[in-house]
C-alpha cells in the first residue's frame, strides 16, 4: 500500500506501524506522533490502508503537548520508583507544562526535586518506553484496584462508558 508522508509517497505493508515506516525513511529525532488522514495518532498504530500522513514534531503545538504528556508519565514512573507507596491522582498537561497531584506518606520537599529529576533523566537516557494501550474501562478499573490506586479508580468510574480508555505504561 502507499502511504503519503509529508507529501511524498512511501511503500508500506499492511500491519506495519507508523513508527517503523518513519524510522526507515526519516532521520529526524523529534517526531512524536502523526496525523493520519487529519486524525492525531500514536506512532505505534498500524497502517490499515492507503493514508495521508503528516508528521508531528516537538516543534508543533500538538507535539509539544505530547512531549509534556510523556514527561508527566515519566514523572509518575520516577515517583513510583522512588516512593512506591505514593498514590497517583492526576497529571494533566497545562499551557506551560504539566503537574501531577499525588498523595504520599511523607510530603515532598525541595530536596526531593533533584532526586526526582535525576530519576527522570536516567529513565529518559535508557530510552524508557511508555506505551499506549487501549483497554476496557472494566479492565482499567481492575488494574488500578490491584495496584491499590483508589484515586485512579474514582476517576475512571466518572468517565462515560463509551469513552476510549488508554493506559500508558
Describe the role of every protein-language-model region:
Residues 1-72, 76-97, 115-122:
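Ubiquitin-like/PB1-type beta-grasp interaction modules and other compact soluble beta-rich domains
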Residues 45-66, 87-93, 99-169:
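Auxiliary tRNA-acceptor-end handling modules of aminoacyl-tRNA synthetases
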Amino acid at each position: 500500500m502507499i502511504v503519503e508522508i509529508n507529501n511524498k509517497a512511501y511503500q508500506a505493508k499492511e500491519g506495519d506501524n507508523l513508527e517503523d515506516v518513519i524510522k526507515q525513511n526519516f532521520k529526524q529525532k523529534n517526531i512524536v506522533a502523526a496525523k493520519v488522514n487529519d486524525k492525531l495518532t500514536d506512532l505505534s498504530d498500524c497502517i490499515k490502508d492507503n493514508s495521508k500522513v503528516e508528521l508531528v514534531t516537538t516543534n508543533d503545538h500538538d507535539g509539544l503537548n505530547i512531549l509534556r504528556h510523556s514527561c508527566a508519565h515519566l514523572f509518575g514512573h520516577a515517583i513510583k520508583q522512588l516512593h512506591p507507596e505514593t498514590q497517583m491522582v492526576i497529571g494533566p498537561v497545562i499551557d506551560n507544562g504539566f503537574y501531577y497531584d499525588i498523595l504520599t506518606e511523607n510530603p515532598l520537599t525541595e530536596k526531593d526535586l533533584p532526586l526526582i529529576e535525576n530519576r527522570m533523566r536516567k529513565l529518559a537516557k535508557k530510552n524508557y518506553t511508555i506505551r499506549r494501550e487501549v483497554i476496557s474501562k472494566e479492565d482499567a478499573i481492575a488494574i488500578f484496584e490491584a495496584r491499590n490506586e483508589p484515586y485512579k479508580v474514582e476517576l475512571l468510574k466518572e468517565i462515560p462508558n463509551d469513552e476510549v480508555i488508554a493506559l500508558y505504561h
